């Protein structure tokens, strides 16, 4: 057969200009694919047969190679299959699943349902039909329930479907109390179990459930799993167990008796427990850190912008209960919880101007005390806990020698408080001084969103602090310049909401602190400037704020799984929240 090659010649009009026309048939690729599919069904020009079970599927190796890196490598790397005209998957693939994948290769269409989604995910991953695998993942994400979330966690881990794994993990964290006795729970890998029990987001109010779940999992395959026990035990919040249970476990539980590392972990928990109950100094051990579901929510507020009282919020019973009076009423302070203690830093009082004072409220013993004062008097600042230390960031201070006292420009200074020596230390300054910014910690780093600049403008930067390097850097840009916003953290996701403009006041965003990517989420139910937010039990709660002359009177809750906001309860109109913190609910004796 001869093949002629035609040279493309350029034609010119009488005026000498070029005359070129491009013809593009949009449906050409679809027509070719349809005709290839017809030839496959008629077994025309097929040069490869795939077998699954006892069924054969004639096809074209060029089509397979074009759709799948798996087949491309098989046919081009000198493997036996590149010479043979048969590939037999035996029983590793169900014939109907292979048929669906081939139909997709020749038509770009596939029907996914509850019966085949898991099989398509597995086969798509195995044969590197990545589009099919991703489509099956997306289908399973939309059909995730408490009854299947453990199985989906195992499946997504095996096939590296990161988003499905994260969604499954989140649902497992929310339903741990009903899942830990199931067959799927016993099938978890050690790393998956660690992902669950190490998370602050684990929704469990009785830590004994976690302790028993770990014992049960290890004993399901004792010979293979007993070496994992100390690592797992260290991630149980043992100091939150009743004292009698701790003592009994030390002398009666064979897994603990037989392992010196486990004995040391239990001894540490017993000492931490004793220290907490006796109010004997600061406890920073992981074994004494409560999970967020074991926290209670506290609103600090007053009948004016001058805060004078702490209120306990029971969002399940929908009650707001007065708890304690502040020793020194103040406004524009910041509050942050470390363990069972709430630290109230700085602010402005009614008489003594800008304050360096730090008041500490012990929620277990319901007592107030004073810690060492800050190095700089400040207000309009932010604070966050990081590695059991307290950081205060930015704000204003009073201008020296000016009467009446007027605020300084926004501060760059950052201070760190270590409760153990009761000492403040000046740390690396912010890249840009800010006040009225949202300050949170996530993944052992500090994040500062927006704020008011030294020039009194809104700031659009995300400032990021690495404590190991003691250095600030610019992490990302905010979707828009922000100040008077609120922030809350769920894992690696930081939720930002509110602001002081018409466009930002009701808006809410999610920032992934690992990828630095922003996602717009559902708007709040009301516009809020100077609101306050925190995360508890895999949900985000927002309280307070105002816009114009309208004061917000509801406690609202955001559910990330449904991307929806709901009002939980009303806040008394006479209560103006100044801060919102989450701390220990109770400690069993």
Curated annotation (Swiss-Prot):
Residues 149-250 form the BACK domain. InterPro entries: BACK, BTB-kelch_protein, BTB/POZ_dom, Kelch-typ_b-propeller, Kelch_1, KLHL25_BTB_POZ_dom, SKP1/BTB/POZ_sf. Residues 46-114 form the BTB domain. Kelch repeats lie at residues 296-340, 341-388, 389-444, 446-492, 494-538, 539-585. GO terms for cellular component: Cul3-RING ubiquitin ligase complex; cytoplasm. Signal peptide: none annotated. It comes from the Eukaryota. GO terms for molecular function: ubiquitin-like ligase-substrate adaptor activity. Pathway: Protein modification; protein ubiquitination. Transmembrane segments: none annotated. Keywords: Kelch repeat, Repeat, Translation regulation, Ubl conjugation pathway. GO terms for biological process: positive regulation of CD4-positive, CD25-positive, alpha-beta regulatory T cell differentiation; positive regulation of fatty acid oxidation; proteasome-mediated ubiquitin-dependent protein catabolic process; protein ubiquitination; regulation of translational initiation; ubiquitin-dependent protein catabolic process. SUPFAM superfamilies: Kelch motif (SSF117281), POZ domain (SSF54695). Substrate-specific adapter of a BCR (BTB-CUL3-RBX1) E3 ubiquitin ligase complex involved in various processes, such as translation homeostasis and lipid synthesis. The BCR(KLHL25) ubiquitin ligase complex acts by mediating ubiquitination of hypophosphorylated eif4ebp1 (4E-BP1): ubiquitination and subsequent degradation of hypophosphorylated EIF4EBP1 (4E-BP1) probably serves as a homeostatic mechanism to maintain translation and prevent eIF4E inhibition when eIF4E levels are low. Component of the BCR(KLHL25) E3 ubiquitin ligase complex, at least composed of cul3, klhl25 and rbx1. This is Kelch-like protein 25. It comes from Xenopus laevis (African clawed frog). The lineage of its organism: Eukaryota, Metazoa, Chordata, Craniata, Vertebrata. The gene is klhl25.
